[in-house]
Swiss-Prot record:
GO MF annotation, one: ATP binding
Family matches, as PANTHER family: ATPASE RAVA
Source organism of this protein record: Shigella boydii serotype 4 (strain Sb227)
Keyword Cytoplasm: yes
Family: Belongs to the RavA family.
Protein name: Regulatory ATPase RavA
Entry-linked SMART domains: AAA (SM00382)
Cellular localisation: Cytoplasm
Amino acid sequence: MAHPHLLAERISRLSSSLEKGLYERSHAIRLCLLAALSGESVFLLGPPGIAKSLIARRLKFAFQNARAFEYLMTRFSTPEEVFGPLSIQALKDEGRYERLTSGYLPEAEIVFLDEIWKAGPAILNTLLTAINERQFRNGAHVEKIPMRLLVAASNELPEADSSLEALYDRMLIRLWLDKVQDKANFRSMLTSQQDENDNPVPDALQVTDEEYERWQKEIGEITLPDHVFELIFMLRQQLDKLPDAPYVSDRRWKKAIRLLQASAFFSGRSAVAPVDLILLKDCLWYDAQSLNLIQQQIDVLMTGHAWQQQGMLTRLGAIVQRHLQLQQQQSDKTALTVIRLGGIFSRRQQYQLPVNVTASTLTLLLQKPLKLHDMEVVHISFERSALEQWLSKGGEIRGKLNGIGFAQKLNLEVDSTQHLVVRDVSLQGSTLALPGSSAEGLPGEIKQQLEELESDWRKQHALFSEQQKCLFIPGDWLGRIEASLQDVGAQIRQAQQC
């Protein structure tokens, strides 16, 4: 692949030209362009009058000398209106059944079929062959067709278990469009004087036939790394477990991989990256319910696994637990000793916290773990004010077990050595101790593990920063991934400061 970054820049400029004068349609244009550049089909779902046909017409200008065909299907549409009329002369003179295809679908690079589900069986069967094999049987001859992009549109989905499902499955990219929402965009659309049929693409950006053919071969050379395959397989397994997940055929998975390869290729990369998998959100859904489900599952994949976010948090949790264990080993030295107050005539002994204990929230370590409220507890977090109240006046005391959840009622007492002791239901006790002072710093073992974890985090963040320059991925998805990585980084830095 020669000059990959120059190619990525060119495709970005080409897309920007195609998007001119279209409002809130950037994502649709970009995915239709990606589909056209990789020879795939697109289904646009949405109400009438939202520029579905204009999107298809614009894509014609992405290619030099491209021919376009568009047709509005009705229940009475005939194959002649889509594939061309019969040649009366050929039938009369030579007895040949042959269509005159000039100006019709078999000779067009860009095809737009509106109200696609109203097509009859004769049209649908021929269309399936055209999509699958890029061939058209014209009488006794089988002719190759130059179709690079089929855009089908409707304001409804095909009925389940109908004869239309086979065609629907061939439409790899599925986009649900709506009216222009933003006020400023709506005003600009109303006042725009641009002729929608003008060619907005400079000649230098248009794709030649030679480039298109060469790119098809080079797209197939883009590799699928093992770690990206594992993410895809994880998504597939998760969908198989969900009762409401849509059925995704092996054919659709395979075609989706080629789309991911094309995304990587036109982004200047030699391999598919995790960020490309976001495109699957527009490939795997079937209806409104599955659209939301697919997006949720891919969001979990991207923000939890694609850059090892969950794995790094699991490692961090293990390091924190190990740190607490090391601190527990030193708990005898740091056992919290409260101060006994005077009050000879007091009916209850009163205590107070040492003056050097000033934190608003105290995390106290158990000298030995206890099972409290059905949980193995190694440390308890107290609000300082609540603990001072209990030391002074007694009554009920609550704390967060292992620092999580709601504060739970505890059986806490002060022993004869003025140490705090917490007891379980069997009255086994464990002395509470202060964590090691920050002045001592982190143990070498913990410090090294955190440094290694931070190094791995930096590598993953750098990978994401490098891969996120992808024209075909919406910015809000990239923002959520960045936020998930920053959250992991913040937790690592917080642990390093303990």
